[in-house]
Amino acid sequence: MEITDEEKAVHYLSHIGYYRLSAYMYPLLSIPKEQHLFKQGVTFGKVMRLYRFDKKLRLLLFNEIEKIEVAVRCAIVNFGTEMTGNPFWMTDANNFSNPSKFNRSIHLIEDELNHTKEDFINHFKETYTNQYPPSWMLTEILPFGVITNIYSNIKNKKIKKRIAQSFGLQVAPFESWLTVITVTRNSCCHHARVWNRIFSIRATMPIRMSRPWITLPTDPLKVYFDMCIIKHFLDIISPNNDMLDKMNRLFATFPEVDKAALGFPSGWENEPLWQ
């Protein structure tokens, strides 16, 4: 590997760490990679550009996932409250199938309530005698993973179906896609590498798609597939979203990045989902 500015390289290594950067060096090694010899023309600058690309990709994904989180929380609260007629339905065991899962959710809810410093929660505690706040308050303080677990445990199938349908999906794929989004979100939050990662969750596919989707063979464990799921949600939540524009600008800034490493198939831009 060519290092043109040794002082700058030492600076980056001391603030980022060799182990973290090594994940971006690995794809640039010659085969067999066990020899730890870099391909011809590899520079430390190229490693850093790949690192920056991944960072900007995480920021892009997190920004789009945030919109999905807000919309999903809202749908679960609105449909759950409307169809049960109970503002406190999230903490009522009668509304859930699995008592053990419900108890775990209650434990997590209580933990959040005990540690939160949100003014609206403190105001509720001081003003009302109810043991728990209504569902629309709880969803503001609960982690997204807890919200998805609450959804998966809802007993009333009509409620689950109504929520899933509002996002153009059947119940099983909706639950699965929420899990995929949660895993991707957590990777972004924890600054994990995402650009060429092989994710562990294989998404459940709908029997039929009511909206434009992808047709080309695609690796469901690569980040491109996660991006397709994100785009599906965004097209419902915000039909005029600019996710594709952001992606194209990112790739234009880093033209050397191999899209195939992210799982992008040749001709992806012509897929119905991306039109």
Task: State where each predicted segment sits.
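Acidic/aromatic/glycine-rich contiguous surface patches that form carbohydrate-binding/processing clefts
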Residues: H191
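Extended intrinsically disordered or low-complexity regions, especially N/C-terminal cytosolic tails and loops
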Residues: M1-V183, W195-Q275
